[in-house]
Amino acid sequence: MNKSILENPKIILIVQGRIGSSRLPKKALYPLGKKTVLHQVLKNLKSVDVKDYFLATDYNSEEFFAPIAKECGFKLFSGPENDVLERFCLLIKQENPDVVVRATGDNPFLFTDAASFSIKRFLELNATSKVDYFTISGLPHGSGIEIFLGKSLLEAAEKTNLPYDHEHVGPALYNHPENFVSVFEPALEKWNFPKLRTTIDTFFDYKKAEKLYKILDCENQPNINSEKLIEVCNLDFIKYPILFMPNTQKGKGTGHFRRCLSLAEELNGFLFLDFNNKTELPEHFENLLENSNLWDENLIFGKENLKKLAENQSEKPFSLVVLDSFVTPKEKADFASKLGKVLSLDDGQENPEILGKINYLLDIIPSSKLKRSPNWKNTDFIPKPKNKKTEKVSQIKTGLISIGGEDPAGFTNLAKIALGKLGIKTTTVDVENPIPNLKEELYKYDLILTHYGFTAFEAKAAGAKVILVATTKLHKTLAKSEGFICLEKKDFKNKNKLKEIIKTLETENSKNQSDTKSQIDIEESSKTEASLKNFILDFSKTKEHFCPVCNSSNNLDKIIFRNETRTVKKCSKCHTIYLNIEKTPISDYSESYFFEDYKNQYGKTYLEDFDSIKNQGLRRAKIMWKLATHTAPAFSGENAKENCVQAPSQGSCFSAQKSSLENCVQAPSQETSFLTQENSSKEKRNLSPQTAPTLLDIGCAYGPFLAAAKETGFAPFGTDISKSATDYVSEKLGFPAFHGDFTITDFQKQFEAVSMWYVIEHFENLDTVLNKVNSLLKTKGIFAFSTPSASGVSGKFKTKNFLQNSPVDHYSIWSFKSAKKVLKKYGFKILKIQSTGHHPERFFKKSISKEKNPFLWNLILQISRIFKLGDTFEVYCQKISSNPKTKN
């Protein structure tokens, strides 16, 4: 018991900070609200009840921090810049505190209630036994503090010369358990959100902090309400930040900007403006911003700030970057792809290299002439006006001219004069004369003259007549392809031609413009208007996947397939085809996966199909046995008992990291290592469980291959992430099985064989998986797996359908070429490739029948086998070396 501390402890709070941060220099001086980040940190911490408050900085920062410390009621102390441990020790020697509370100057949202609780707990713990260091684990990153005994830190500094210990403070204590007692107490449930981040370590952190500060109204609050902060941090726009990047290039109008601005308002997203600051904004953009509800905190100005957002990030900072560029240039695509997964709206870009950096292409306005395919065309996202004409226009008396915010080609005045000569009274929409909520005002006019874009389709839906102007060649092409009348400048100078066009529009009541060859009819498009806002929000929550082998964001990877729900890429390094984007929810592999889902696909449940799967397993197990007989000593019984993996028991053969032994399902008999006595008597090979070569089946499901492997002579062991499956394997089949993630399980013995049957494609990270398999196998051990084949008839000749029909939980699609390259990288040599899944009916557009044409059927079957054109294949390989990342 530490009576001196308990009686009247002197507790001081030290905030550590400096301007020389390597990742974000001078971040403590960044504006936050009306003052600075450091102001908010110090103001917040003043509510923690201690004896005295200090700001411990370095000599170079002293002049910048002195006035802030004084204003906030903190005493300033200066010490070495890089030896932070020494800085703290000097202050402790000066003040001689019993207890020190340490916080950092880049955490403006620190939980002061958790800090006060921590002090109380630290004193309680020290009432019974000495605790040198205390902190709460599980708080949002940037919300906690550290507490330690002053004398203990001085002692720790004397004992360590490690640079890391001196660059920080706490490690000098908690990294030396032989000398000091440290307690990491789990956070209370209300604070336990370790995945949330509230610190300011990067420019992106700062931009997020600006939002949090405004939402929490920190300007008017004495300290942070932790529960409110957690609530806000779990809001969609904080958890899934979205960046909108419109085209703001001169001469491209305001349509792209207005769409992004509207979406940013609705989703509380960030808006990038390609200007250095607000003063450089053109008047039309400035007016639109002033009339919007978007916060200044949501604006990001200039390319330099855009670059800073990507700096020092372990992963892409934004959940989604939305491009609205008309035609996305290479530089913009490069920027966007470094910041988050990329969705582009109505993109006229056709260059495959640039499009390869765009994860999802959404075409809302029809663009049939483009030489590229989008993921999805959905004109229902075009906003539909609620106000519509009740009668068709028979005489055009009024017109609205809306050519965009800039009208660089000068159509507005030309059209106004030309239509005026025909007696049509016109109203113009421009920067100086905007019409709020223009979409709902269109029905008031007989004629709308605009360019190809939303307004054209909205006007059509409102019942007005529509004439478009050819602002660009592409706009002209698209307008004509959708059945709109499209005029060039010269047409407005031809009064007779224009008069004839107006007359045609007036007399086409029986054949309204909505009956032209346009791809869509807005009025009849859909009963309910699709929400672009909701689509973008949902898409922001979709995960971007990278090559499961190389596991890196490689913008050189080619996109080989797009559809409404997915994007598929091919790795430029290892040639693996992989799922880049998948919007459809992925199965959780619960019991229904093997029963209802399996039956829907195959007409029977997994257990009803057990014998058929087992028969295939017998063939596979025999191949594995044959390939290994002359190479793996244990297959002949040599040293088998020593190498045998035992069934889990009190002396378990493995322990699971992040798992307890309750995940390990016991085989019914503890007398044998793998088999019950009943099962042992049925073995075909003359090997006892102690001498049988061991086999681990990863993704064993309900155990048909385990049963086949046992009959072949193996001592089988299973693992699966489905608990119902491993329970069945243990209780019904009598084989030991482990429920959980095999990659984080510490198997203390190695196996002679490892198998994965239609499992390997389900792993998102194959690098981890293949390294683990290598470590599980003895040298010369056999690794066998089966998987869908990109080298088969469907993958080669019906690629689009093949990729379209690939299950949503298949992260990779293997080919013979990629298998050879990838397996070699992980220390395996392929011994045999078996092409399977032969389907003669898939060789022709029109399916052939085995019953009606048996000769052709069998001929194609033989061709498929000879040229290995099956839609699945099996790989049998041997471990020839340990991968550098693994340890035997």
Protein language model features and the residues they cover:
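N-terminal nucleotide-binding beta1-loop-alpha1 segment
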Residues: 2-24, 241-246
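S-adenosyl-L-methionine-dependent methyltransferase catalytic module, highlighting the catalytic core
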Residues: 764-772, 782-880
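Conserved N-terminal segment of class I S-adenosyl-L-methionine
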Residues: 536-635, 644-647, 676, 680-683, ...
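A nucleotide-sugar donor-handling region in carbohydrate enzymes
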Residues: 225-226, 357-410
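Conserved core of the sugar-phosphate nucleotidyltransferase
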Residues: 67, 110-199, 204-215, 230
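Conserved catalytic-core segment of nucleotide-activated headgroup transferases in glycan assembly
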Residues: 255-259, 388-430
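Short phosphate-binding loop-to-helix
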Residues: 59-123, 300-310, 327-328, 435
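Catalytic binding pocket for nucleotide-activated donors in carbohydrate/polymer assembly enzymes
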Residues: 456-500
